């Protein structure tokens, strides 16, 4: 190589060459390679049998190093004996290939013959066609059901899952009605309080309403007459006013119901006499056709004809009209029949008992309401559970 810096492989990346980082740069004979046996460039043109073929000997001993084999010198090496493990057969032998089915079971190739179906009775032949143990035709016995008896009791294979939508809707319906009922109840309870405030304001024109029956134990406790505490003497008068307001609201609801029934044609009317265009004469009687019959519109007679029909005026006495409304509601809401014994007992009370009950509610009702008010929301829940479960 000498001082020729353009020689091949100057940094000695091939075998048996070492790199000198300083390559004697500070000397008169700089060099990159520490190998003392490296070939000089003029010797690379000599003819010789090297690793790259005859006539070319690469510098530095060739790509494969300085060994005789690298320089193209062929030597005969003794062959090593094979390992001892290959001299004998040991362990599991490979599974031989299975012969074709047409050679082992020629009758199986005849698909439409009875011989093939008979051959399928052989478990070995069946395994070739139906590894899972199935059947190809209806002539074969089906695979027995391996399901346990306990599992067949609780569920049948293939049954669809229960419809959770129908199950949840049966509970969500009453709960939504209950929630709407509580919402309406809270709104309805504010109506008597507003009417009570308007009623008491009539006695205090031009001034703020102040309760005249203040508690003697606390003369300085001024309060509104619409929010008297139970210890105030004006508390019972407040309850009486609200009771009258409730009756007035019920009367308005009854009038609205009568107007609605009359608009829908469900009020009792007099039937026409067959063969005539006029109604029958006679006193107004109670309804003769109950609501559970074929017709939901009861028929009765009256003395005020109007275009062939007439409305029963006055409304049938006693409980006739209430009985009709009850029967009409019982047809549409079957669970109301469970309240029939209680309603019959309540309707059979004498007027004296009614007045006594009203007086007790007016006198002890506020105190009982304060005691039972935490449990009142539970009553509709228990009632729904009792009806639907």
Curated annotation (Swiss-Prot):
<keyword id="KW-0946">Virion</keyword>
<feature type="topological domain" description="Intravirion; in external conformation">
    <location>
        <begin position="192"/>
        <end position="242"/>
    </location>
</feature>
<keyword id="KW-1133">Transmembrane helix</keyword>
<dbReference type="GO" id="GO:0055036">
    <property type="term" value="C:virion membrane"/>
</dbReference>
<feature type="topological domain" description="Virion surface">
    <location>
        <begin position="264"/>
        <end position="337"/>
    </location>
</feature>
<keyword id="KW-1160">Virus entry into host cell</keyword>
<feature type="region of interest" description="Pre-S1">
    <location>
        <begin position="2"/>
        <end position="108"/>
    </location>
</feature>
<comment type="function">
    <text>The large envelope protein exists in two topological conformations, one which is termed 'external' or Le-HBsAg and the other 'internal' or Li-HBsAg. In its external conformation the protein attaches the virus to cell receptors and thereby initiating infection. This interaction determines the species specificity and liver tropism. This attachment induces virion internalization predominantly through caveolin-mediated endocytosis. The large envelope protein also assures fusion between virion membrane and endosomal membrane.</text>
</comment>
<keyword id="KW-1170">Fusion of virus membrane with host endosomal membrane</keyword>
<feature type="lipid moiety-binding region" description="N-myristoyl glycine; by host">
    <location>
        <position position="2"/>
    </location>
</feature>
<feature type="transmembrane region" description="Helical; Name=TM2">
    <location>
        <begin position="243"/>
        <end position="263"/>
    </location>
</feature>
<keyword id="KW-1161">Viral attachment to host cell</keyword>
<dbReference type="GO" id="GO:0019031">
    <property type="term" value="C:viral envelope"/>
</dbReference>
<dbReference type="InterPro" id="IPR000349">
    <property type="entry name" value="HBV_HBSAG"/>
</dbReference>
<keyword id="KW-0007">Acetylation</keyword>
<keyword id="KW-1166">Caveolin-mediated endocytosis of virus by host</keyword>
<keyword id="KW-1162">Viral penetration into host cytoplasm</keyword>
<feature type="topological domain" description="Virion surface; in external conformation">
    <location>
        <begin position="2"/>
        <end position="170"/>
    </location>
</feature>
<dbReference type="GO" id="GO:0039654">
    <property type="term" value="P:fusion of virus membrane with host endosome membrane"/>
</dbReference>
<feature type="topological domain" description="Intravirion">
    <location>
        <begin position="359"/>
        <end position="364"/>
    </location>
</feature>
<feature type="topological domain" description="Virion surface">
    <location>
        <begin position="388"/>
        <end position="389"/>
    </location>
</feature>
<protein>
    <recommendedName>
        <fullName>Large envelope protein</fullName>
    </recommendedName>
</protein>
<feature type="region of interest" description="Pre-S2">
    <location>
        <begin position="109"/>
        <end position="163"/>
    </location>
</feature>
<feature type="transmembrane region" description="Helical; Name=TM3">
    <location>
        <begin position="365"/>
        <end position="387"/>
    </location>
</feature>
<dbReference type="GO" id="GO:0016020">
    <property type="term" value="C:membrane"/>
</dbReference>
<keyword id="KW-0519">Myristate</keyword>
<feature type="region of interest" description="Disordered">
    <location>
        <begin position="75"/>
        <end position="107"/>
    </location>
</feature>
<keyword id="KW-0261">Viral envelope protein</keyword>
<keyword id="KW-0449">Lipoprotein</keyword>
<comment type="similarity">
    <text>Belongs to the orthohepadnavirus major surface antigen family.</text>
</comment>
<keyword id="KW-0945">Host-virus interaction</keyword>
<feature type="glycosylation site" description="N-linked (GlcNAc...) asparagine; by host">
    <location>
        <position position="309"/>
    </location>
</feature>
<keyword id="KW-0472">Membrane</keyword>
<feature type="transmembrane region" description="Helical">
    <location>
        <begin position="338"/>
        <end position="358"/>
    </location>
</feature>
<dbReference type="GO" id="GO:0019062">
    <property type="term" value="P:virion attachment to host cell"/>
</dbReference>
<feature type="topological domain" description="Intravirion; in internal conformation">
    <location>
        <begin position="2"/>
        <end position="242"/>
    </location>
</feature>
<keyword id="KW-0812">Transmembrane</keyword>
<keyword id="KW-1164">Virus endocytosis by host</keyword>
<feature type="region of interest" description="Pre-S">
    <location>
        <begin position="2"/>
        <end position="163"/>
    </location>
</feature>
<comment type="function">
    <text>The middle envelope protein plays an important role in the budding of the virion. It is involved in the induction of budding in a nucleocapsid independent way. In this process the majority of envelope proteins bud to form subviral lipoprotein particles of 22 nm of diameter that do not contain a nucleocapsid.</text>
</comment>
<keyword id="KW-0325">Glycoprotein</keyword>
<feature type="transmembrane region" description="Helical; Name=TM1; Note=In external conformation">
    <location>
        <begin position="171"/>
        <end position="191"/>
    </location>
</feature>
């Amino acid at each position: 190589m000498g001082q020729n810096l353009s020689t091949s492989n100057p940094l000695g990346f091939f075998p048996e060459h070492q790199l000198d980082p300083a390559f004697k740069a500070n000397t008169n004979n700089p060099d990159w390679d520490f190998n003392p046996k490296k070939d000089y460039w003029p010797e690379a043109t000599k003819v010789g049998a090297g690793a790259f073929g005859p006539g070319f000997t690469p510098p530095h001993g060739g790509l494969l190093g300085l060994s005789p084999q690298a320089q193209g010198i062929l030597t005969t090496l003794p062959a090593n004996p094979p390992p001892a493990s290959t001299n004998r057969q040991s362990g599991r032998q490979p599974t031989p290939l299975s012969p074709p089915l047409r050679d082992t079971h020629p009758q199986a190739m005849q698909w439409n013959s009875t011989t093939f179906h008979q051959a399928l009775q052989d478990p070995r032949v069946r395994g070739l066609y139906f590894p899972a143990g199935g059947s190809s035709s209806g002539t074969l016995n089906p695979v027995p059901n391996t399901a346990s008896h306990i599992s067949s009791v609780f569920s049948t294979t293939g049954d669809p899952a229960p419809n959770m939508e129908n199950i949840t809707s049966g509970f969500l319906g009453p709960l939504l009605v209950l929630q709407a009922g509580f919402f309406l109840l809270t709104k309805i309870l504010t109506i008597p309080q507003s009417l009570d405030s308007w009623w008491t304001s009539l006695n205090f024109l031009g001034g703020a309403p102040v309760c005249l029956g203040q508690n003697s134990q606390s003369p300085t406790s001024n309060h509104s007459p619409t929010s008297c505490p139970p210890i105030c003497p004006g508390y019972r008068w407040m309850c009486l006013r609200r009771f009258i307001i409730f009756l007035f609201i019920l009367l308005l609801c009854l009038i609205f119901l009568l107007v609605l029934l009359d608009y829908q044609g469900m009020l009792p009317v007099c039937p026409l006499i067959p063969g005539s265009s006029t109604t029958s004469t006679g006193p107004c009687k109670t309804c003769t056709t109950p609501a559970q019959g074929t017709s939901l519109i009861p028929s009765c007679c009256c003395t005020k004809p109007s275009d062939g029909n007439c409305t029963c005026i006055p409304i049938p006495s006693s409980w006739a009209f209430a009985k009709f409304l009850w029967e009409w509601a019982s047809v549409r809401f079957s669970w109301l029949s469970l309240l029939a014994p209680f309603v019959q007992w309540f309707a059979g009370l004498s007027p004296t008992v009614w007045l006594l009950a009203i007086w007790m509610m007016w006198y002890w009702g506020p105190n009982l309401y304060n005691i039972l008010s935490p449990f009142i929301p539970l009553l509709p829940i228990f009632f729904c559970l009792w009806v639907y479960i």
